[in-house]
Amino acid sequence: MIDRYSREEMANIWTDQNRYEAWLEVEILACEAWSELGHIPKEDVKKIRQNAKVDVKRAQEIEQETRHDVVAFTRQVSETLGDERKWVHYGLTSTDVVDTALSYVIKQANEIIEKDIERFIKVLEEKAKNYKYTLMMGRTHGVHAEPTTFGVKMALWYTEMKRNLKRFKEVRKEIEVGKMSGAVGTFANIPPEIEQYVCDHLGIDTASVSTQTLQRDRHAYYIATLALVATSLEKFAVEIRNLQKTETREVEEAFAKGQKGSSAMPHKRNPIGSENITGISRVIRGYITTAYENVPLWHERDISHSSAERIMLPDVTIALDYALNRFTNIVDRLTVFEDNMRNNIDKTFGLIFSQRVLLALINKGMVREEAYDRVQPKAMESWETKTPFRQLIEKDESITNVLSKEELDECFNPEHHLNQVDTIFKRAGLE
């Protein structure tokens, strides 16, 4: 991922240095496990643990000759050791190291992402509670429907991110898995105890069955889950973009002193952060196809997935980490124009209360079809003439003979739409 959309902590996880360090840790743990089984002298393992060092530049120099990164790595590490170097990579195949270390690196990335999600959820919780009863216009098909509250909108985002967190925790169990089962997964030259020891010490699980590789359905599920998190962010970002339109202006991204919105138009205050999140989400989601196409490897392995994953996994995790942090800050600092929200409710001449009038007529004994056919023409006339809907209703004796002034007052009371907000919040776990 380019530096522009990378945060240092996450980017450092995907450096060559950290990758080789993870490989080295797997190699050393394997030696320790062999030693526990009495196969490698403990003194040799101690020397390996103390003296083995990673030199990325040297490993890459060797790779120019070997054309094999793991062989180059093991030879570079061996250069830092004495006779004990013969135990490095003992009984292992390259992917025992690469796949297990990759899962360990992904685990490091996951710990950051999980904290990112939890922080965003906390901000959404605060926003939901702060604007619990702030009335605003609910829209369906982009058209005014009925009032809701900005707090309910935030509660919706909150519950969606809680689901994302649950899914993320589930996929962590699938992806944070190692394998050290040899060339075709049969443990022909390495006992299962080695795998168990290494994975236990890395804090990851073991694959119950593997080939030379971990199966890539795990990685496809992982990428799809991260893409769904990103897509939720895009959904929220698009809502902010729509609510910041000049004609609506119910919210606005924070605009810093000295910030510029346009090189040509000095007045511009654009939702560039939310637009940025929209674009990043597209990039992340685009990797789903790559992840799924990595699943059908040949027989017990090929490396067609390798080149794709070297690009895909850093890109997706780094981009999502960036997006989560940036969008959390956007929502946290969001300006909310409560007066505009209330004013927008009145822009459609009271038409948004048409269902309340319809239901009131039905409750007083009118057949639904008759009630609908009496209310709709008044609604259409209000649309076309910009006449207040209630004014037209009050001129129709077939309606006023059924509904009293007090009953009409209740029909046109926007506060009615707050009646179940407490229930919604309770169901969302936002008490």
From Swiss-Prot:
GO terms for molecular function: (S)-2-(5-amino-1-(5-phospho-D-ribosyl)imidazole-4-carboxamido) succinate lyase (fumarate-forming) activity; N6-(1,2-dicarboxyethyl)AMP AMP-lyase (fumarate-forming) activity. Pathway: Purine metabolism; AMP biosynthesis via de novo pathway; AMP from IMP: step 2/2; Purine metabolism; IMP biosynthesis via de novo pathway; 5-amino-1-(5-phospho-D-ribosyl)imidazole-4-carboxamide from 5-amino-1-(5-phospho-D-ribosyl)imidazole-4-carboxylate: step 2/2. It comes from the Bacteria. GO terms for cellular component: cytosol. GO terms for biological process: 'de novo' AMP biosynthetic process; 'de novo' IMP biosynthetic process. It catalyses: N(6)-(1,2-dicarboxyethyl)-AMP = fumarate + AMP; (2S)-2-[5-amino-1-(5-phospho-beta-D-ribosyl)imidazole-4-carboxamido]succinate = 5-amino-1-(5-phospho-beta-D-ribosyl)imidazole-4-carboxamide + fumarate. The active site is at H141 (proton donor/acceptor), S262 (proton donor/acceptor). The keyword Lyase applies. N(6)-(1,2-dicarboxyethyl)-AMP binds at residues 4-5, 67-69, 93-94, 212, 263, 268-270, 276, 307-311. Pfam families: ADSL_C (PF10397), Lyase_1 (PF00206). Its EC number is 4.3.2.2. Keywords: Lyase, Purine biosynthesis. Catalyzes two reactions in de novo purine nucleotide biosynthesis. Catalyzes the breakdown of 5-aminoimidazole- (N-succinylocarboxamide) ribotide (SAICAR or 2-[5-amino-1-(5-phospho-beta-D-ribosyl)imidazole-4-carboxamido]succinate) to 5-aminoimidazole-4-carboxamide ribotide (AICAR or 5-amino-1-(5-phospho-beta-D-ribosyl)imidazole-4-carboxamide) and fumarate, and of adenylosuccinate (ADS or N(6)-(1,2-dicarboxyethyl)-AMP) to adenosine monophosphate (AMP) and fumarate. Belongs to the lyase 1 family. Adenylosuccinate lyase subfamily. Homodimer and homotetramer. Residues from neighboring subunits contribute catalytic and substrate-binding residues to each active site. This is Adenylosuccinate lyase. The gene is purB.
